[in-house]
């Protein structure tokens, strides 16, 4: 009996969820000084990195040709789906933590730790790799003199390590960590400055491309490409066409355009850093959704414009994969423009570096404040900055940039990001179908009047909710549910979302590794494909039939459950495409994370060790007021359910920094 009780207690620890209250939402130990413009600049700077100067040429030459503009459109639509899910959670739970926090309040502690631990890896590798890229780009402008010096005197001949230690990258990371520790307001100004320069350079590229471009480069004939291949003595492709495709706007067909879209999807990664600023924004419920959606729109316009200008200036088959824009300007005899491009590239790398470094200490801070990581990381400076987490993040990233060859580790960034996207989309589905009780809004809320009609309707239906929650599960409640969500319908949706993720995983594996069997029309593959598709559609339609919570927040994802479900499909499919070596490295990282969680985090979690407010104030500026000594497990669950459904709206609030 005792072992069973211990196992049950252990299982409850893994699925316990974070309690978020109105009191904890309005208070913050961090400096509330960021505006909507700051968030847009942060999102654009983080997302619109140096990839815009390189990725367009690489994808256009190898996959899409001139139809790269369509590839970016498809990738942008897929990214917007994830962005909208982040935007809703940013409006519901405007606290520091991003996907880690959203997972914690919805599906439990273990998944939250997995999400946060992977985000830490993604941001560390991102910061280190961008720092080395900045160092390498600057070295190129100096004719590689810095690299030659370190190769001569500090060469490292060890497997897995870099060719030489990058002292310049270390200085860059530590300088940025110092800037972030000094204050978020100053960091925001630096980011806006470099982002503005980057945007101006990209506008110059677009205008120059459209002026010097030629529409004929989008209409190259297949015969012309065959002649070029023959003159270069290059063998034709398997289908008899040129190795450069069939010409025209889609030389590699629509499959090539889709392949390019899968690569272009990663160009929109980075907007999630906006979601980590919930406690540093003056009006988070409005600023975070606007910042995410606007930054993605600006980035799409930039990628679309640059790729169009590039393929108009120069035939796609002549594009240089490493430096497409400088080579294209030389092709149209505007050689001096390459210096403008180099300046823009350095500015883009600077904003991308800040965009990778900015959210990392905030994830560490949020996890440490909740007790899942070492609590010294939750210390806040007098300038209201998470100084301990920032300096720790800077040191770790600097060591990575100093010693390691990060090319083999970059794919691991994708796992953390795609997993976070998938979980946030799943959490939106689960949260929107939870039953909710109505609580009085804070009397200082200026937006309260806009929500009163919904609130009154919910109050009138409170007795009906109580009656419905007593019903048991049956097929009738499955296909003909009540008008209001109940605990049974919420549990059903939670199960169906998990089952849908499992089905999508199976479908992705089948279409990735069994595509040849499907092409040969083998019976087993077609049967599995049909089964997965039918079950996915049935699950989504069943979720759609369930009643949603009618309470409103400042932003809500449209087209539920179809949009989040499609976002989960895209993210899981891209995760399946990653190599086995990447998953092995990921397993090692997760083993280290589980060691920390089960040795430290599970015992020090605030949700498992409730304290009163004064204790939390002393414990490294922890401002969570939800946990009180007298709450029982049932009270915590009821409190969690009702708080998640509240339309959290705070007034614009600033603090002295």
UniProtKB/Swiss-Prot annotation:
Residue ranges of the TM segments: 38-59, 64-84, 105-125, 164-184, 193-213, 249-269, 290-309, 340-360, 386-406, 410-430, 490-510, 524-548, 557-577, 582-602
GO MF annotations, alphabetized: high-affinity L-arginine transmembrane transporter activity; high-affinity L-ornithine transmembrane transporter activity; high-affinity lysine transmembrane transporter activity; L-arginine transmembrane transporter activity; L-lysine transmembrane transporter activity; L-ornithine transmembrane transporter activity; low-affinity L-arginine transmembrane transporter activity
Keywords (A to Z) from UniProt: Amino-acid transport, Cell membrane, Glycoprotein, Membrane, Phosphoprotein, Transmembrane, Transmembrane helix, Transport
Subcellular location(s) of the protein: Cell membrane
UniProt GO cellular component terms: membrane; plasma membrane
Function summary: Functions as a permease involved in the transport of the cationic amino acids (L-arginine, L-lysine, L-ornithine and L-homoarginine); the affinity for its substrates differs between isoforms created by alternative splicing. May play a role in classical or alternative activation of macrophages via its role in arginine transport.
Homology family: Belongs to the amino acid-polyamine-organocation (APC) superfamily. Cationic amino acid transporter (CAT) (TC 2.A.3.3) family.
This protein's name: Cationic amino acid transporter 2
Gene name as annotated: Slc7a2
